[in-house]
């Protein structure tokens, strides 16, 4: 393993992205999310993703110099056209406008269209909670996941992220795929030659498997059976047809076998609790804290607690990167 400081991780990411002629706006936005993944010990969304970024670029499936375009479509609605660039750059452009609309209207939604997406959603919902807003974000991906009772992929991993601001300490945040696990976790098991648990995926014949490669060729499974399947369908609708963008099946067809990152849209919703509650805001937000205390007092963890603990460790001790991955990343500089 190679130990690196967070600054060193960021410097490496920036060098690689610049080497491949990404615009400076893309360089900074993408590097920040990759560092966030490593910092929070979320390796599936860390610097390993650079391999996919560059592969997607070489396949011609992402625009390195795309300039996102903002469309103000209603008092509580806006749209950012990523023009084929990475989602992070488009999100950054739209964020201040989403904040302004949510504070003005009490609730606002932002669609990010025609973007290439690989980022963890918790990075974005945390940006909204830092501004005191309640946040919800979701996006389809490629059709990798079979519906409950089926054997062929039709859904993406279709994550859902939620954030709730808290007066002291980190926000209440969860970000999970509606599949049993993020696809990146299976890919990391494949890289390490490790078996996956039963319930993560099936092979090409629809049979349960512990072989990571077989699951990647076959289909992933939803979490919770029909419940996860219904939520996956909801994500397809909210961040696909509702915002005029692709479903996961359409994204995979657009990919044309290049194995690039998913292409499509993302939906973000921001709610200002103080506009919703008015003069009684403090009273009701305090009741939320009572709920959280009741969870923790039982010895249970709040979602993302491990990430926040990892964040403190990484700031102090740095992070570790597998040597093989480090060599692959350095090769991208050649």
From Swiss-Prot:
Catalytic site positions? 44 (charge relay system), 45 (proton donor), 185 (charge relay system)
Q: Which Gene3D superfamilies does the UniProt entry name for this protein?
A: 1.10.1530.10, Hypothetical oxidoreductase yiak, domain 2
**Catalytic reactions on record:** L-pipecolate + NADP(+) = Delta(1)-piperideine-2-carboxylate + NADPH + H(+); L-proline + NADP(+) = 1-pyrroline-2-carboxylate + NADPH + H(+); cis-4-hydroxy-L-proline + NADP(+) = Delta(1)-pyrroline-(4S)-hydroxy-2-carboxylate + NADPH + 2 H(+)
InterPro entries hit by this protein: Mal/L-sulf/L-lact_DH-like_ah, Mal/L-sulf/L-lact_DH-like_NADP, Mal/L-sulfo/L-lacto_DH-like_sf, Malate/L-lactate_DH-like
- Entry keyword set: NADP, Oxidoreductase
Family assignment from sequence similarity: Belongs to the LDH2/MDH2 oxidoreductase family.
Q: What is this protein called?
A: Delta(1)-pyrroline-2-carboxylate/Delta(1)-piperideine-2-carboxylate reductase
Gene this chain is encoded by: lhpD
